[in-house]
A protein has these predicted regions:
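A short, glycine/small-residue-rich beta-strand->loop->alpha-helix junction that serves as a flexible
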Residues: 2-11
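Donor-binding and catalytic core of enzymes assembling or modifying cell-surface/extracellular glycoconjugates
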Residues: 6, 185-272
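Short amphipathic alpha-helix
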Residues: 12-19
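A short beta-strand-loop structural module common to alpha/beta enzyme folds
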Residues: 25-36
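A structural signal for isolated positions on well-ordered beta-strands in alpha/beta enzyme cores
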Residues: 27, 155, 195-197
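Short, aromatic/basic amphipathic alpha-helical patches
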Residues: 37-49, 206-214, 274-279
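Secretory-pathway luminal glycosyltransferase catalytic domains
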Residues: 38-191
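Leloir-type glycosyltransferase catalytic cores
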Residues: 270-288
Length: 288
């Protein structure tokens, strides 16, 4: 199942590619967006050069109808069990680590986020190829892209928006001023003459915190259906400072530069563990 915003859709698609490598008849189901629009809706095929195989209406209905009677939901840490007729598999608790056996799940309907590179490490090259941005940049963004590739550019992602709303704030508001200050200091200590490019849904907040050095550029102008352009531009930077956000996770992961430094918060959520979400070659910075 494909659901939620762009970054999460990308994790789910990457999981699909890994599954399809083992089970050639794997299909996606993005029908949830017809009934429950989220963020900018289903975006994968609009933004990237991907052509996943979609489950048909009959296939989806058959799964849903049968599910009322015999689907078993497995939330256990150890993973899942096989049934002769099939099964609904809900992602095991990510706080206990990833579940490699799921890559060989047969006759299953899988729901989850699958937020770790470990699920698709063996098909990483294919995932990178698939996540080629379809649309050319406009003249203004192309000029910025050229700068990013020529300078020792550092993308910094600050996500506030939905993260500071009362119902999510306690768990999601992880990337503090101190996190960004430590990240900037780390980059300055390890990179000669870095240029920081800040991508944020609240640039005013970033400017008011006195975190960033003189010459920092705050990138703006990409909202709504064009928000993905921020990810595209982030991926062109030399180095990355990400938020606890799947959006900036992919902005960093898609980068192709050599000797890249990627800094990530040591805590993804305040009250939930995510031990596998940060790749081994990224550097964790204390977020408290």
């Amino acid at each position: 199942q494909i659901h939620s915003g762009l970054g999460n859709q990308m994790f789910q698609y990457a999981f699909y590619v890994a599954l399809k490598h083992n089970q050639s008849n794997t299909k996606i189901d993005a029908s949830i967006y017809r009934h429950r629009p989220s963020h900018n809706g289903y975006e994968l095929e609009r933004i990237f050069a991907v052509e996943p195989v979609h489950a048909t209406i009959d296939e989806r209905n058959r799964m849903a109808d049968v599910g009322k009677d015999w689907f078993s939901v497995f939330r256990h840490t150890i993973g899942w069990k096989r049934k002769t007729h099939g099964q609904l598999v809900i992602e095991p608790n990510p706080s206990h680590g990833w579940c490699p056996d799921l890559l060989h799940c047969d006759n299953c309907y899988l729901q989850g986020y699958w937020q770790t590179e470990k699920y698709f490490a063996k098909v990483a090259n294919q995932v990178r190829m698939d996540f080629t941005f379809r649309q050319p940049l406009n003249a203004i963004d192309m000029a910025l892209a050229n700068k990013l590739t020529k300078e020792k550019s550092v993308s910094v992602h600050i996500r506030r928006g939905d993260y500071i709303k009362e119902r999510r704030r306690a768990d999601y508001e992880v990337c503090t001023v101190e996190y960004y200050r430590r990240a900037v200091e780390y980059i300055q200590a390890h990179v000669d003459s870095p240029v920081f490019y800040v991508f944020s849904d609240d640039p005013t907040w970033g400017q008011e915190q006195n975190i960033f050095p003189k010459g920092t550029i705050f990138v703006s102008g990409h909202e709504g259906v064009d928000a993905y352009i921020d990810m595209q531009l982030m991926s062109l930077c030399c180095h990355h400072v990400i938020a606890n956000s799947s959006f900036s996770w992919w902005g960093a992961w898609l980068g192709q530069r050599e000797n890249t430094i990627t800094l990530a918060p040591s805590t993804w959520f305040r009250y939930r563990e995510r031990p596998d979400i940060i790749p081994d070659n990224w550097i964790k910075i204390d977020a408290e």
